[in-house]
């Protein structure tokens, strides 16, 4: 407790003596702790009863009650000191003056008689001398815990009383007033020992600060008294150190709230024992044995106990005064009980309010304690007017010392009537209760600061507030900018979405337009190809007819029978082929699209794919065998048209692929968006589906697989034919006896029938392919037809050429057409005839079955054809004749082809112009 007290010395100098009045002021002590300190001091002083300096509690209330200028009696010798007294004391507030005037009315003559003190001149000088000696060496440590004043010392020097009966009187409190009444009889004995009392009082009053008596003069000092005083001072210092230690221990006990009521009971019991021992105690015993027990207890901010130094002889006091004081004491005890209850309730309320938390204005007022708040001003003034310790006060309040000069005016009034005390105490107590509730016992850390430091702190606080405002403004600005950026970004995203939607719509429109254009182009191309096919068909029919007519003429010139050829001129071969081609054209252009649910992209894609594949196959076939009947210029034109078709198909395929990739990319993009919504990505290579093993042969394209299958079947057929031909039974049959040959017409008919029978599977295969590929173009059909007809013509030409060479040297039998069949087998060799020229009569005896078999073998194997394999030819002359006939035939065909080209080209140009003009 002592470490938290900050002591400030406030010197007040007087003009005459120059002595310093020292007083301590506790500045940073909360009122609650100060109250605890007073309790502890009273407890220790009552319990131990140690000798210490006299404790007084001078307050402004004493001044208010007892200042009475009518009762002031001062000797002429001390009159010069009054100006200094007036100078040293502080000015009294108007409220205090008003209360003083109010208190004057209640002071009676009885009270003035009880408050009178008589001193002789010698005793007064002796007291002044001892007081002045004690004031010189007083220290701040002695006054640290016990603040002193002499507010109740009143001097009066009258000429009526004798000089040996001058006594200083102690004005006692109501609690000890009965002690004075009962000690009147014992005061006569103290006259002989007054000098001893003076010495004791001088020793005990060493701690008293400079007051009004320091200006009344100085006398010679006694050395023995000084030495005694020094010894007493040392002793008192030791006692004070021990007292401080005890107070610290007591403060630790007071910090425990559960022990408060026990200590209060102990103090109250001790006070009661003190009141009971009033009959056995004299004033000398009180002064000598227990000076620390003479304390001031205030209730309702009015003195209940006042002690004074008693150096007086008997003064006659009335007996009724003691009964009145006993009644007052009883009332005071009741008030004290009420105060205990009120204080208990107040502490409970304070605990409740402190548990709720401190208010903001109290906190701000705590940190700005030196600023002039009206609440704090009223709080300080109320404290200075009313100090309310609970039971026993060890040291006076801080604010009482600031107005200590108010006590220096001596009064003769002793007490105020109890009714007036209660009347004055109630509003004051209410005010004190309000102030105690308002103050929250906060420790003020800025109480000792300079105003400059407080201003500096204010400036720092203002700067900090400005800095905080700037930071909040920056944060708000950043938030606003972020919000604007977010809005701008949303707008841009919406614009981008709208732009993408517009682009998507434009692309969709463009795609539809491209599809429409593609359909129109395809329709135009189909019309063109149909017209071209019709013109080619008509030209080919005309060429075939002319060729057959020329052949018939040539055969007729050579002497052959051409009746069968004339009959068949418009017969099976050309009519059948042209009819079948017409049916194929009708099937390709048949309105199947109109009779089923259509998907345009799929149909067009299939058409273009089939067309491209068929185009490649047709091109390969044309390269393998180009017919000499179609002119070269027409072939070039056909290749150009085919190349244009292939390029268009490729472009369409690319467009289809692009659109498919776009769709796939859109699907992937949406899939990515869906994946973004999923919090977890799928694991890789987990639970993969098992794939079926696919052999390499099945990985080829469909068209290539078909070609491979066809090649395989063809190879198997060739192998079977070879095995059958090399069979030994077949060879022995050929070596058997030859029957009679039929007529030449029968052989020719049989031979033609065999050719037709052999060509039928080829046609059926081609038509089965056409049925599979319905979307095959008419141009391809034309190529296939022309290829087939060319192969038929070539073989017929070969046969006719052979027969012509055979019949030309021997024209004896012109009416018979005997086909020449080459064979390695020798029948009935004639030694005169050449080996390669068998006799005609031998041929008549040949078996027709063998002839048919040989013809089949001849047409099956191209390897044994003498035109294709010249090494097999043994008769060079005959071969040369055959080749010569073929060259002549070729020259005639070429000439006919040129004539047809010159006739067909202007016709085709006119047809194309008419076709373009129609569109």
Curated annotation (Swiss-Prot):
Cellular component aspect of the GO annotation: axoneme; centriolar satellite; centrosome; ciliary basal body; cilium; microtubule; midbody; photoreceptor inner segment
Record's keyword annotation contains Disulfide bond: yes
Keywords carried by this UniProt record: Cell cycle, Cell division, Cell projection, Cilium, Cilium biogenesis/degradation, Coiled coil, Cytoplasm, Cytoskeleton, Disulfide bond, Microtubule
Gene Ontology BP term (one): microtubule cytoskeleton organization involved in mitosis
Chain segments carrying region Disordered: 145-166, 456-505, 724-744, 762-816
Primary localization: cytoplasm
Tissue specificity as recorded in UniProt: Expressed in retina and blood. Expressed in retina, mainly in photoreceptors but also in outer plexiform and ganglion cell layers (at protein level).
Annotated compartments: Cytoplasm, Cytoskeleton, Microtubule organizing center, Centrosome; Cytoplasm, Cytoskeleton, Microtubule organizing center, Centrosome, Centriolar satellite; Cell projection, Cilium; Cytoplasm, Cytoskeleton, Cilium basal body
GO molecular function: microtubule binding; protein homodimerization activity
Residue numbers spanned by region Mediates localization to cilia, centrosomes and spindle microtubules and the interaction with PCM1, CEP290, CEP104 and CSPP1: 570-919
Biased composition (Polar residues): 150-161
InterPro entries: CCD66, CCDC66_dom
Chain coiled-coil ranges: 467-558
Task of the protein: Microtubule-binding protein required for ciliogenesis. May function in ciliogenesis by mediating the transport of proteins like BBS4 to the cilium, but also through the organization of the centriolar satellites. Required for the assembly of signaling-competent cilia with proper structure and length. Mediates this function in part by regulating transition zone assembly and basal body recruitment of the IFT-B complex. Cooperates with the ciliopathy proteins CSPP1 and CEP104 during cilium length regulation. Plays two important roles during cell division.
Disease linked to the protein: Defects in CCDC66 are the cause of generalized progressive retinal atrophy (gPRA), characterized by continuous degeneration of photoreceptor cells leading to night blindness and progressive vision loss. A homozygous mutation in the CCDC66 gene resulting in a frameshift and the production of a truncated protein is probably causing the disease.
Oligomeric and partner information: Homodimer; disulfide-linked. Interacts with CEP290. Interacts with PCM1. Interacts with ARMC9, TOGARAM1, CSPP1 and CEP104. Interacts with CDK5RAP2, CEP152, CEP192, TBG1 and PRC1.
Protein name: Coiled-coil domain-containing protein 66
Organism, scientific name: Canis lupus familiaris (Dog)
């Amino acid at each position: 407790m002592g470490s938290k007290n900050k002591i400030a010395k406030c010197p007040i100098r007087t003009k005459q003596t120059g002595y310093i009045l020292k007083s301590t002021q506790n500045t940073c002590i909360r009122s609650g702790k100060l109250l605890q300190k007073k309790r502890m001091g009273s407890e220790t002083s009552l319990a131990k009863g140690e000798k210490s300096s006299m404790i007084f509690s001078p307050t402004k209330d004493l001044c208010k009650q007892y200042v009475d200028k009518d009762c002031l009696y001062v000797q002429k010798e001390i009159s010069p000191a009054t100006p200094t007294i007036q100078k040293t004391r502080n000015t009294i507030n108007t409220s205090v003056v008003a209360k003083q005037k109010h208190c004057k009315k209640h002071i009676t003559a009885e009270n003035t008689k009880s408050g009178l003190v008589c001193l002789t001149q010698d005793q007064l000088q002796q007291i002044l001398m001892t007081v002045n000696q004690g004031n010189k060496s007083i220290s701040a440590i002695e006054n640290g815990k016990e603040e002193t004043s002499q507010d109740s010392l009143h001097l009066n020097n009258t000429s009526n009383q004798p000089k040996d009966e001058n006594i200083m009187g102690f004005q006692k409190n109501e609690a000890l007033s009965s002690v004075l009444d009962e000690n009147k009889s014992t005061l006569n004995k103290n006259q002989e020992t007054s000098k001893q009392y003076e010495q004791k009082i001088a020793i005990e009053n060493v701690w008293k600060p400079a007051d009004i008596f320091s200006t009344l003069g100085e006398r010679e000092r006694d050395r023995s008294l000084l030495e005694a005083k020094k010894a007493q001072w040392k002793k008192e210092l030791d006692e004070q150190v021990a007292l401080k230690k005890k107070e610290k221990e007591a403060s630790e006990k007071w910090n425990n709230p559960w022990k408060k009521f026990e200590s209060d009971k102990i103090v109250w019991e001790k006070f009661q024992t003190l009141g009971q021992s009033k009959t056995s105690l004299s004033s000398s015993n009180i002064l000598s044995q227990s000076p620390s027990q003479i304390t001031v207890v205030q209730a309702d901010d009015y003195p209940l106990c006042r002690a004074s130094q008693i150096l007086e002889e008997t003064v006659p006091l009335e007996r009724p005064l003691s009964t009145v004081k006993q009644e007052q004491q009883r009332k005071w005890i009741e008030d004290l009980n009420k105060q205990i209850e009120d204080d208990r309730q107040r502490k409970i309320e304070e605990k409740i309010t402190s548990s709720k938390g401190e208010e903001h204005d109290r906190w701000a007022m705590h940190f700005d304690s030196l600023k002039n708040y009206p609440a704090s001003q009223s709080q300080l003034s109320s404290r200075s007017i009313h100090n309310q310790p609970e039971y026993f006060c060890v040291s006076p309040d801080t604010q009482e010392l600031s107005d200590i000069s108010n006590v220096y005016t001596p009064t003769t009034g002793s007490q105020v009537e109890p009714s007036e005390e209660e009347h004055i105490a109630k509003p004051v107590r209410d005010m004190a209760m309000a102030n105690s509730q308002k103050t929250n016992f906060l420790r003020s850390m800025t109480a000792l600061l300079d105003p400059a430091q407080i201003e500096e702190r204010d400036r720092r606080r203002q700067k900090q507030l400005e800095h905080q405002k700037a930071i909040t403004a920056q944060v708000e600005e950043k938030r606003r900018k972020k919000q604007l950026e977010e809005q701008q970004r949303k707008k841009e995203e919406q614009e981008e979405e709208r732009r993408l939607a517009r682009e998507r719509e434009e692309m969709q429109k463009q795609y539809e337009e491209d599809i429409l254009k593609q359909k129109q182009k395809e329709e135009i191309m189909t019309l063109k190809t149909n017209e071209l096919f019709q013109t080619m068909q008509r030209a080919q029919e005309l060429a075939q007819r002319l060729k057959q007519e020329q052949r018939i003429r040539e055969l007729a010139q050579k002497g052959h029978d051409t009746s069968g050829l004339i009959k068949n001129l418009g017969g099976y071969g050309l009519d059948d082929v042209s009819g079948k081609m017409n049916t194929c054209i009708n099937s390709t252009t048949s309105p199947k699209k109109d009779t089923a649910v259509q998907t345009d992209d799929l149909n067009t894609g299939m058409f273009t794919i089939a067309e491209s594949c068929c185009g490649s196959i047709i091109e390969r076939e044309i390269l393998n065998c180009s017919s000499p009947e179609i002119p070269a210029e027409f072939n070039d034109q056909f290749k150009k048209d085919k190349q244009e078709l292939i390029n268009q198909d490729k472009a369409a395929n690319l467009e289809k692929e692009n659109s498919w990739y776009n769709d796939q990319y859109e699907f992937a993009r949406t899939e990515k968006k869906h994946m973004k919504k999923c919090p977890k990505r799928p694991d890789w290579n987990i639970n993969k589906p098992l794939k079926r093993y696919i052999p390499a042969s099945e990985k080829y394209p469909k068209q290539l697989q078909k070609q491979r299958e066809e090649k395989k079947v063809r190879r198997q057929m060739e192998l079977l034919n070879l095995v059958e031909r090399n069979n030994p039974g077949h060879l022995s049959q050929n070596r058997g006896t030859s029957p009679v040959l039929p007529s030449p017409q029968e052989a020719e008919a049989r031979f033609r029938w065999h050719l037709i029978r052999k060509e039928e599977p080829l046609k059926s295969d081609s038509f089965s392919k056409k049925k599979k590929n319905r979307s095959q173009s008419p141009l391809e059909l034309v190529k296939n037809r022309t290829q087939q007809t060319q192969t038929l013509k070539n073989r017929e030409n070969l046969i006719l050429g052979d027969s012509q060479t055979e019949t030309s040297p021997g024209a004896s039998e012109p009416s018979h057409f005997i086909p020449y069949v080459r064979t390695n087998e020798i029948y009935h060799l004639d030694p005169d005839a050449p080996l390669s020229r068998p006799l005609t009569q031998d041929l008549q005896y040949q078996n027709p079955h063998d002839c048919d078999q040989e013809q089949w073998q001849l047409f099956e194997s191209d390897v044994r054809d003498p035109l294709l394999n010249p090494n097999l030819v043994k008769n060079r002359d005959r071969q040369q004749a055959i080749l010569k006939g073929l060259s002549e035939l070729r020259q005639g065909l070429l000439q006919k082809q040129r004539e047809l080209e010159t006739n067909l080209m202007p016709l085709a140009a006119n047809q194309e112009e008419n076709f373009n003009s129609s569109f």
